[in-house]
Each structure stands twice: as structure tokens, then as C-alpha cells.
């Protein structure tokens, strides 16, 4: 299996600020010692405080935004690791290891191809659940700018954001300012439509507001990704899933993040893939998820 990416590094960054963005989440901004090359959206870093007050094992976080040497991470308070990061003060050191993993595919590519060989490439729907929104801000930015391939017109990108309630639609105004269609769904009906994000997609397709044939990117809770995986299999519409998987090392050594592969898919030669190396982004037809 592949080794960790050649551009991965371990370095100390400086915490700059924490900005609340809804519920128990905040955006952590850190500054690396020097400007970093542009990083493909949905790659991640392992983060850990360096003052001895945090768990020894770092935590994986997708890059939310990048501005030269400055990196933003969307942090949700969940346990000791995230709580220690949310207690950082400006100027404190943070250990970063990365960038790690792969990222979203080139959204300007005609692949995966439409079922009709003569048809235009299908629109993309970006399905986010809660903090699963983290890898999508840069994905949209990079697609619009043509950072990795040609630019994608804004009307060909549809961002669908689902959460339990309005408070978990983290940093929603920032996504609305990107200029792509944004649709929301909440389980309690406090913002957008009531229901789950996949139900939102199917409703918008029935109404003709999103084409019947699309290509999907998805990141969110396990049950949401299982539903998107099943939808892709059922409908034949291609999807890429960015898994929110627990990781021990992030570089493929500990074997703590196995993902069962589909024996008919592109990773069929291996019984399991490593989420930190072959992922976190997988084609839906490459892996098996429990339903």
C-alpha cells in the first residue's frame, strides 16, 4: 500500500485565534513557520497541543481554509483532544503533522462519466453533515478558481448542508458568500427543510432544482455516509465519501483505521484500506459500509 504523502511534515505552528462558529464549535487559526503550497481540499493534519496538557495522540482535522502560512481548522468540542485545542491561547504552540491523506477529485474532470456518453459532465452536489462541512469550503474555492484543473461554474456546484439544528450549521454565512447554490436541512426544522441532507437532495431533484443525474461528494456522520453510500449503489450516481474515521497515527503505521474494501471495486486487491493513507476520500464503489 502507498506510503504517507511525500509533502507531509511535522512542525510547530503558532495558535493565532479561536472564533466561535455555532454550537460547541470554533474555527482555530494557526500559523506555520513558512507559507505552505496550496493543499487539496479534504486532506488533513494531525493536531496536538505541545504544553503537556493534551492527550499524547494527536487528533485528525480536515483543513478548513488556507491562506499562505495560515491554516484554519473547524473544531467541535467532543472529548479531551478537541477540548484542549479549544482552550488554546494566542501565541501557544501547536504540533501539526501533515498534510496527510488524499483529497477530493478534480471537480472540473468529466470523470466519473455520465451514463450517456454524449451527455455533458454531471453537476456536483456537496453533501455535508455537521462538522462534515469542514472539507467543503476549500473544495468550493478551489473548484471555482480552477486550482486543480479548469474552473467549475458556480451553478454546477450545489452545497447541501444538514444538521440537527441551526446551531450545528457551522459558519453557514461563509458558505453562502461563496456564490454557489446553498440549501440546508435540519432535523428539528429550525433552518431550511426538516429532515436529513439526503432527503433534501432527493426533494430538490424531484422539484427540478437539481438535475436528476449528479455526482456527489459527502462528509459527515457515519450513518449519513452509509445512507449516501447506499443511495449511490441504488441510483448508480457516483459518489466520493470523506470518512470521519478515528485515527491513531495518521501515517499508515498503526493500522488503526481499516476500511473494508469492495471486492468488485478499484481496491479489491486489499481486504482493507487505511483511511489515513488511501483515504480519507474514497469512491463509494471502492469500499463497503455497514447498513
For the regions a protein language model found, what residue spans apply to each?
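SAM/dcSAM-binding transferase cores
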Residues: 274-277, 284-291
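Short, low-complexity, intrinsically disordered N-terminal peptides in bacterial proteins
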Residues: 1-10, 112-120, 207-210, 265-266, ...
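Local cysteine-cluster metal-coordination motifs and their immediate loop/turn environment
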Residues: 135, 222-223, 244-280
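FNR/FR-type flavoprotein reductase catalytic core
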Residues: 82-246
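Structural signal for conserved beta-strand scaffold positions within catalytic alpha/beta enzyme cores
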Residues: 17, 65, 184-186, 241, ...
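Short, surface-exposed secondary-structure boundary micro-motifs
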Residues: 50-52, 99, 262
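Ferredoxin-reductase
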Residues: 2-90
